Structures are given as structure tokens and as C-alpha cells.
UniProtKB/Swiss-Prot annotation:
The protein, known as: Histone acetyltransferase type B catalytic subunit DDB_G0275159
Cellular component GO terms, alphabetical: chromosome, telomeric region; histone acetyltransferase complex; nucleus
Site description Interaction with histone H4 N-terminus, residues in chain: 198
Enzyme Commission number(s) from the entry: 2.3.1.48
UniProt family annotation: Belongs to the HAT1 family.
Coiled-coil regions listed in the entry: 372-459
Active-site residues, Swiss-Prot/TrEMBL: 279
Any one GO molecular-function label of the UniProt entry: histone H4 acetyltransferase activity
Amino-acid positions noted as binding acetyl-CoA in the UniProt annotation, renumbered to this chain: 240-242, 247-253
GO BP annotations listed: subtelomeric heterochromatin formation
Group of enzyme by EC: transferase
Keyword Protease recorded: no
Amino acid sequence: MTSKIKSSNTLLTFDANEVTNIKLVWDIEELKNKDKEDKAHIKDEEEDEDGPVSFHPSFSHQIFNDEQVQGYEACKIDIYMGAGSLTSYIDTNYTLQSKNLTNVEGELLKVFSKQDPPISKQSFYKFIEEKEKSFKPIGKKIHEYTITDKESGEETEYEVYFGRITDQAVFRYHEKLQIFVLWYIDGSSYIWTDDPNWDIFFIFEKRIIDGEKRYGITGYSTIYNFYHHPEQTRARISQYLILPPYQRMGHGKYLFNSIHQYYKTNDGFYGPVYDVTIEDPADDFNLLRNYVDLKNIIDEKLFDNVILDLNANNKSVFEEIRKKLLVPHKQSKVCLEIYLFSKFLATPNSNPKYKEFRIAIKKRLYKQNIGDSEQIEKMKQQVAQENEDNLRLEQEELQELQDIENKKNGTNIKVAINTKELTTPSEPEKSKEEIEKDRLEEIIQLYKDLEENYHKTLSSLNLITK
């Protein structure tokens, strides 16, 4: 490695997220400026705008145990990647040859692209200088948009591209890109790319450097195509990520709308797309989804004929929304909840209609959350009973075999039964009243959280004052 860091005899432990720096490099000048900073001993957090964009991962537990790196010297992990090509170079002093306990380089190589693994520093510098500028976005361009910086007024152009995993260029590029989901989506895993049902949408930033167009990755989403009878496709968003330097800028809504717009006019794997669903969305993604879906519904005036009652039959309205916007019925109901909530904001809590509205939502939350937990508890009890029955059966069979041996030998030996006692709760069992009270408190908290999220969505849509 190029840097020399003083070692000690004391075992040190480092937070893997804090010591890892991911750097997106657009141009060789950024690397030259970085080298000057290194010589001047300037720390990463003191970098000026002339160096590469640098940021830390949010998660690393799928790469390093407990998100920790252990060794006998200060840990350095700098991961350089071409902003567009994602060609990479790992600069770390925790290698297989070092005496440190964690082989950082080895662990990272396990999760990086196998077709395009990290290269040496010399090769990386040469690639950035000679080839990075020739990188072109992968797939088919389907949309473009401009974002204006609120402070400087500077406009930046972005382009959205679509590709299928069966396209070898898309497959290979995704293999280099997918490491970001381990760093930024908790509990994520790599998709099974041998399955042809995967679609991928990419966002690229466009810059002009030395009079030439340059492109850098901004974010992406993976979509799985499910079969929907008859001869239709149900598109499910699986992974959805905007890279840290581009977050809180509005890219999420542009990508979300681009996905829906594409599938409205293009077939999925099995035929026309029936709707677009989400796989296990996080809270932040739900906020984005609710904002975009409700805005589109209002812009298309699709709630103009809706019955303002959660208990009413609005199936025909929801079906029209699905056909025009590819929003599933269930999500349309959520949007209706938010829309109705805006109508009751200036209404006293004692208002009968508002009271009915709150009760209807709490009933849904109860069924959605408590109902599921009751089912899980029943399943746990069934499994425990099955295990107990199986254990008893094994013990009986064992005793029968021993009885046969006893008769042969004229002895009377009893098998030492290895009974497995059921674990008793450490606390006294709660009464039905106490259990129900806990459940109601849970629902009340869920409702409060829901109200807060609905407020955020309505504020974003300027339907209420922040």
C-alpha cells in the first residue's frame, strides 16, 4: 500500500462504517488534487471541492462481522470508483499480508464484481485518465430532467435509462453497482441475476468536462416481473437506492415516476403491466410513494368522484386509478386515507364523521398488525406442540427398543428419558384485559406515527401549512 501507518502491540477495534470512504471519481484531476492533499496531510472531512466526492457507508455488517475491523494499526479503507464506469481500486493497509486480524481487502473482494474486480492504483489512475471519459450510460434512455441548486441556481441534467438483466451490458454493470445495496439498504442481499425476470432502471448525472459529455451514476432500482393472469405482468420494485451525494434533491420522485411511465407504455416480461407494487417498503420509501401517488391522483382528478368515506365502496375509482397510473387498489386506499385526513384537519375531534374516520383507520391497523401477531403466536404454539409430540414419540420408540433388549438379556433397564421442559415465562402470564390494553396502546402509537407521516405527505403537496 502507498501509505505507512504506525503500528502498535495493542489490539484496536474500529467502526467499519466510519473508517471506510467511498470516492466517486470523474476526472484524473480529482485524483491529482487528492494526492496533493495526502502529501499535505489533509483529512477526508477537510477535503475541498477539487477532490473526488467522498462518503461513508451506512451499513457494513454483511461484509465485516459486527461492522468492526480489528488490528494493530490505524485503519484506512479508501474505495475509489469511476463515477460512471464503477471501475474500482481499494486502498487499505489491512491486507492479507499485514498482521492485522481483519483482512479488509479479502473481505471486500468477496462482495465486489467477479467479472470486473478492483484493480491496482496504477491501473486505476491510467483508466480514469484514458477511459473514464468514454463511459456511456447502460440501457435505453427513457427520460431526462433538470434539477436546480437552490443556493447557486446552477442547473444539472440527469438521464434515466432502462435495461433488462438478460442484456449482458446491463448484467455486467449491475454486478459492479450492486455492492451499494449492502452499504445502504439494511438487510439487503444481491438479487439472483440468472433469473431473466429482472428489469433495472438507472439514473445518471450528465456533466460537461473539457467540452465533453461525462456521465456518473446517481441511483437505480431493480424490478421483478411476476406473472399476472391472463398474460399480464405485475412489476414489483425490489431495491431502490439514490446514492448519498444525491439524496434529498428530488431524484427519488423522478425515478419513481419514470418507472411507472415506462410500464404504462411498454410491456413487462409476461405482457402489459397490470400494476406496480413494492417489496417490503421502508418508512422513508412509503413517504416518497405516498407523495408521488397522491400527487398523480390529484393531478389526474381521479379523486373527484370518490366517496369521502373509508367504509364506502370505491372499487370503481380504485380500478380507474390502477388502469391510468398502475397504482394497486391497496395503495389507492392509503392515498384516500391521506386525502380524507386533509379534509378533517380543521375539524374538531368530537365531529362524528372525523371520529368514524379515526376508528376506521385504527381498525385497519389492528387487523394489519395485531391480527398478524395473533396468527404468528398461534403458529408458534402449533410448532411447540409438534416438537413436544415428536420428542415424546421418539422417547416411546426408544423405550420400546430397550424393552426388547431387556427381554433378550433378562434385565429390566429403563431408558433415561431426556425430557425437554417447556420454557416457562419469566414474568407472570398477562390477563386478557392486560393483553388487550397493550394492543390498544400499540394501535394508538401506530396511529400517531401514521398521522405524522400523513402530515409530512400533505405538507409536501402544499395541501396544509408546514
